Amino acid sequence: MKGNIARIVAQFKQSWNKELEDDAIVRACQEAGHQWRERELGPVATVKMFLLQILFGNVACEFVPHLAGKDVTGSAYCAARGRLPLAALQSLLSRCTTKMAACVRDTGLWLGHRLFLIDGSGFSMSDTPALQKHFGQPPGQAAGCGFPTAHWLALVHFGSGLFQKVITGALRKSELSGVSQMHPELEAGDVLLGDRAFSSYGHVALLMSRSLHGIFRARATLIVDFTPGRPHAIPGKGKSGCQPGRPRSKWISSAGPLDQIVEWFRPVEVPAWLTAEDWASLPATLRIRVLRYTIARPGFRVHLVTLLTTLLDPERYPQEKLAEAYGLRWTVETCLKHLKTTMKMDVLRCLTVCGVQKELTMFLLAYNLVRMVVLEAARCQGVPPERISFIDALRWLATAQPGDVLPNLVIISQRPGRFEPRVRKRRPKVFPLMKNPRAVLKQALLAQQLAP
């Protein structure tokens, strides 16, 4: 059968290969309480076909039997896929990811630390009542004129590009509402990189309680003053807390120009993603480091960047290294682009909540498999993993046969400082946006006698 990924990647001789073998799939289904009769489309064959479908760009179910060389209909495959328990697929993903992460544990260390990236994103899906109710749709769209959209939070290992964990939720759900579920995936001493959304007092306090570190861009609402011995305001402390313009942190020491150690006071307001009890249990102050630097490129505006970090030692973690680390945060955007654009996960096809979650699970498994191919190619070809073409690795994995040896993959040219304007040259066909449900528009066409 085409698409036997376990046999294709067996040449890598790594522990995670075994988690894709037939016995592992059967064990995952049994542990999920799934019962079946061995037919043409048992769970082993269905999982392999599902993975093949994703690797080929989430093609239509009718096309998958042709890809797999199976004499079954597309509807039979779709029904078999629906019978797969979500828990079994999640177990496969979890076990594979755990074994993969162990293989790349020391890949891409930053000053001796493992580096992880966190970011939020979204994906669209079919317009069904069940999906609308569970996920919701973007504001400004009338009922029947938009599509349900899910929000998801992703944790990515910098050195390998593996998706370590993903949490999905309703569109209007705060990114921080699920961030604490990411922390158990990290170990003491790991460093988490994120944008302004993750630089809140509550999140930093939760990180520090687990001996984790963070490097985040400071929120615009954070008042920063690098003047030594400057005055400050203590939230909730009478007149002291009601002095606008004063930082809500106490200056402790200078770590260099535009670089300081401060005592950050816990705000009075309880964030919506924490309970009052959890908020009260956080420490009243946090000792953090705040620094500022500029990014200047010829022909561009100067950007001012203010970072907030728990890495306090200026000798071990100089300002330029912290700025360099924060610049690596863009890696997570590249990973999301590969998953959503290259692999075509931007719009999922299933019609139920469980089906969408299965689809997402298989996308993550397929993505991590491609990432391991990239890492193996980088090792064999003697180049950094970021130089190996992701799409070339995807194409090889999708079309390889058992026994095929991994060839030399395309190496991306080094183009430091390269940038392109975010515009499209090819003009799309212009159609008006749907502002009324389809049934209403059809009635309008009939009334105007414009229907064919």
Language-model segment annotations:
Residues M1-N58, V64, V72, A79-L84, ...:
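Single, function-defining residue in the core of a domain
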Residues T98-D106:
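A short, well-structured juxtamembrane/interface segment
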